[in-house]
Amino acid sequence: MKNVLAVFVVLIFVLGAFGTSGPAEAARDSGTAKSGLYVEKVSGLRKDFIKGVDVSSIIALEESGVAFYNESGKKQDIFKTLKEAGVNYVRVRIWNDPYDANGNGYGGGNNDLEKAIQIGKRATANGMKLLADFHYSDFWADPAKQKAPKAWANLNFEDKKTALYQYTKQSLKAMKAAGIDIGMVQVGNETNGGLAGETDWAKMSQLFNAGSQAVRETDSNILVALHFTNPETSGRYAWIAETLHRHHVDYDVFASSYYPFWHGTLKNLTSVLTSVADTYGKKVMVAETSYTYTAEDGDGHGNTAPKNGQTLNNPVTVQGQANAVRDVIQAVSDVGEAGIGVFYWEPAWIPVGPAHRLEKNKALWETYGSGWATSYAAEYDPEDAGKWFGGSAVDNQALFDFKGRPLPSLHVFQYVDTGTPFKN
């Protein structure tokens, strides 16, 4: 009887600790694994699955005095730290001319070709491939704006198409000459309804093909990706993929942004990507994702999440952040062999200084372009950057803390292969 009672008491304790969902769910909520982080193994994951990050702001951050550290608390090249954490791919955005006539940068990393080459060389030196993300704009290109570069503003369409082809080819030639291991090229960024100032899909398709041609002629082994967003909108991706097919656009990868607080369910993401892959024989991936680990603002510039009205399906904790990344990887893997990878957006865009030092932060953002936009960008983007220029809106979604130390969630990239064991 005593033995039976003892077993009953232990059972009550276990259920009280983990609830009826079991230790896996409890660990997923609290991170009770040996590593301090619980990551469930991703089923069906390809051995060559892309575990990527976009660290486009890194040069500007380092120029602003930001340092990064390894697990032991010693300063270390962030690219080495990323590689050690299981990252195998780096994405970098490329703007044609993100400067005003006096050479003042628009911010957001001031990501021109020179910056891309610096980042690409460091990625290659640490054994990671590069995804070159051409925006074909002088600043941010997204569904709300796809402004042509200043130098192309007065070109007719045929000349613009030629300029896009030549710019792509010359840029890739320079990157290859620098010894960069380019694995993929993105022809446009979140091009839901525009590209380089064009909004007609017949013309957009010709521009896509001009960029694709430049890639094919540079290196036939480089994958060509097209990038879209808002997978939660019913029928959007089916319509885009059919339109690309109808206009005979040459590409390999249909890429999607997926931010959990904006873009619907993971089930839907898998469904719409599977439909594109199965119908048109394309590879698919997530080119951008991220998640919050804290609600704190690190630099005095407001963050994009969390906010009222957003759907946050995981806790705003380091463990919740790891859950979110792991689940996006699973969603893409669930597509099957066509699901090739996931990129985390700006995991190192941490504060250049604490929030209470806002005025000093502003000076660094303006000088080095280490915030999302400078006041100089107003001439090119008056309605957005001109009004809301400032610092990092995603410092609370980084995979490093505000002082540059790696969070446990950074290791989700290596843990998805095996999972993490529980603490004893």
Curated annotation (Swiss-Prot):
Gene3D superfamilies: Glycosidases (3.20.20.80). Pfam families: Glyco_hydro_53. It comes from the Bacteria. The active site is at 190 (proton donor), 288 (nucleophile). Its cofactor is Ca(2+). One of its GO terms (biological process) is pectin catabolic process. Binds 1 Ca(2+) ion per subunit. SUPFAM superfamilies: (Trans)glycosidases. Involved in galactan degradation. Degrades arabinose-free galactan to galactooligosaccharides, producing galactotetraose as the main product along with galactotriose, galactobiose, and galactose. May hydrolyze the beta-1,4-galactan linkages of the galactan portion of arabinogalactan type I, a pectic plant polysaccharide from which most of the arabinose has been removed. This is Endo-beta-1,4-galactanase.
